[in-house]
Amino acid sequence: MTQATSIGSWLVLMAVMGVVSPLFSIGGNAMVADLIPNHQRAQAYALLRTAINLGVVTGPLIGGWIIAEHSFQTAFWTAASLLLLLAGLAHWFLQETRPELKKDTPQSKQSVWKDRHFITILLFYTFSVMGLIEMFILMPIYLEQNFQILENQSSLLFSVNALIVVLFQYSTTRWASRFSPFLMMAVGALIYALALGSIPFLETFVFFIVAMMVLTIGEMVINPTVTSYVSNLAPDHMRARYMGMLEMVYRVAMGTSPLVAGLINDLVAPSWIWVYGSLITLVGAAGFISLYLGRFGKN
């Protein structure tokens, strides 16, 4: 990034980053599932999310200090050096955790796409994430264009989100683990819908922060629950494939939801962005409720 001087070079870098960045979450989530018993996985994924968001809170602060005292180039070189160091530590100290594949397991003939239950969960989760993505991608633009709240102020929303996750993710997940996973997925999606649906009625920055806090509660409920459920659902030797498909939900949502919302902004009205986001998350919530009722009926 220190050598990127044009839009074209940045596009190439972003494309490479888009391919490489999911590898950590896929491998990390699969490794957690290999190491942790089923009944403790939700808490383990909560701790993993806490660590990631701790980096989200502290990284920009450290990076901003380096930029202020030195330069952008120094900040990028420092980040690259730390990542190389971490890659080396992971290579030398982390051991393979994937269970050995039994000889009679028809690995080559198995396909993630044939697991209809899993694909159904992915579909409903995609609807939920499509609403979530709006808050992180479109909110700064919405605030600047309609309320003259600049990016250096709106970035506080994301710091609040990360800080709440650091402080409350583990305790929230322990509470949510007492209930049906499908029920908690539905609750998380409904909280998304509530937060997004409130935004057209807000006019002051303090209330936008409150909306982000509400959204974060939904995020803390649904994300570890889905990840834990999928890790339990996946066969041992196909865990990384299932986690890869789960990670793809975010890529699909990031590629589609801002595009649809942008068209709504241009053709209808800016406030209808959030109506769309709320409705799409309600579709996800309805799907999870149907799964919960179906499982409840069987039990």
Language model region names:
Residues 240-266:
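A late C-terminal transmembrane helix in Major Facilitator Superfamily
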Residues 1-5, 191-203:
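C-terminal ends and interior cores of transmembrane alpha-helices
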Residues 82-99, 287-292:
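C-terminal membrane-cytosol helix-exit motif in multi-pass small-molecule transporters
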